[in-house]
């Protein structure tokens, strides 16, 4: 059943496609796209000067991921980690937190595996900071693995310190 203005339209009266004048408001429930590869078509708003490949928003997802942390030299003996992601179309934003409870012999750079989606292009840059000392961090993603290092070419974190990082990339 569809209600338009003060009229109610039953399923048997609905033709495909449905064209309605004005805005559509859902007062309860969700708008569900029931077929893979379909979504919201923005082609009526074409305004880019480049070569367009798609104006269809067909994917949105958010969730959590579990960062698996090691070091490029030696080994970290204990850590806590938490990650979140948002995927809109082909664009993914990852954020994550790592707390080093015991660095062990870890040195070099921090390696983080387990990103939810593989990057289409290697070496997309990330940004982060050491929450404990304020040092800026950088790094990159290759596939689903990230490498984090300190701008000053120092090991990015020590026992008892935490880092927060973020990266946005294309899949």
Protein language model regions, located:
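Generic beta-strand structural signal
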Residues: 26, 35, 87, 140-142
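Residue-level detector of beta-strand structural context in well-folded domains
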Residues: 22, 81-83, 137
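Extracellular attachment/recognition segments
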Residues: 114-150
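Substrate-binding and catalytic surfaces of secreted/luminal carbohydrate-active proteins
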Residues: 92
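Intrinsic low-complexity, repeat-rich intrinsically disordered segments enriched
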Residues: 1-66, 70-72, 95, 102
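Short, structured beta-strand segments at or near domain termini in extracellular proteins/domains
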Residues: 159-171
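Surface-exposed ligand/attachment interfaces on beta-rich extracellular proteins
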Residues: 35, 45-56, 64-88, 97-120, ...
């Amino acid at each position: 059943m569809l209600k338009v203005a003060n009229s109610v339209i039953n399923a048997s009266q609905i033709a495909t496609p449905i064209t309605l004048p004005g805005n559509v408001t859902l007062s309860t429930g969700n708008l569900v796209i029931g077929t893979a590869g379909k979504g919201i078509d923005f082609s009526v708003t074409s305004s880019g000067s480049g070569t367009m490949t798609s104006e269809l928003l067909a994917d949105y997802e958010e969730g959590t991921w579990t960062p698996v942390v090691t070091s490029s030299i030696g080994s970290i003996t204990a850590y806590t980690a938490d990650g979140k992601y948002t995927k809109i179309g082909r664009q993914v934003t990852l954020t994550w937190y790592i707390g080093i409870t015991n660095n062990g012999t870890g040195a070099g750079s921090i390696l983080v595996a387990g990103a939810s989606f593989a990057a289409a292009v290697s070496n997309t840059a990330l940004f982060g900071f050491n929450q404990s000392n304020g040092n800026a961090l950088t790094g990159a993603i290759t596939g689903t693995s990230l490498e984090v290092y300190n701008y000053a070419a120092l090991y990015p974190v020590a026992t008892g310190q935490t880092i927060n990082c973020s990266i946005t990339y294309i899949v």
